[in-house]
């Protein structure tokens, strides 16, 4: 059974982010299932630090992007998801290619969501783990 409360297509989701940080970083929503959603991002001049490695802050931006989107898609109309906390552990460097972030729920309640975001490289090696907590505000 799906957790998604909104009807969407990947094209619609990618259109939403094209003129903001999501688009500038090259983040693309790439796949979803009944209780997970993924985004991919290039490791290139936009996303690396001066030593040519994926910037840790950009990994966190990717995690917050896909986790916040997951929260938005899994709440009812008349609610908004607001970030309360995010943390990340950077496990291995990435020099090139793409990384993929997959968000899955840890806990979904009426007022709080906790999402696990795993970021993997093209060899499916875990590069970063992140946890995002969202406050669900009822309008």
Predicted regions and their residues:
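Terminal targeting signals and extreme-terminal segments of soluble enzymes
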Residues: 1-139
């Amino acid at each position: 059974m799906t957790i998604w409360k909104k009807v969407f297509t990947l094209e619609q989701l990618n259109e939403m982010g094209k003129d903001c940080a999501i688009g500038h970083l090259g983040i693309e929503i790439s796949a979803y299932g009944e209780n997970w959603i993924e985004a991919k991002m290039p490791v290139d001049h936009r996303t690396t630090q001066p030593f040519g490695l994926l910037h840790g802050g950009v990994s966190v931006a990717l995690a917050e992007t896909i986790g916040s989107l997951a929260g938005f898609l899994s709440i009812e109309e008349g609610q908004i998801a607001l970030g309360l906390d995010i943390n990340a552990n950077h496990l291995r460097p990435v020099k090139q290619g793409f990384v993929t972030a997959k968000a899955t729920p840890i806990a979904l309640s009426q007022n709080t969501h906790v999402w696990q975001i795993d970021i993997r490289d093209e060899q499916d090696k875990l590069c970063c783990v992140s946890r995002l907590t969202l406050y669900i505000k009822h309008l």
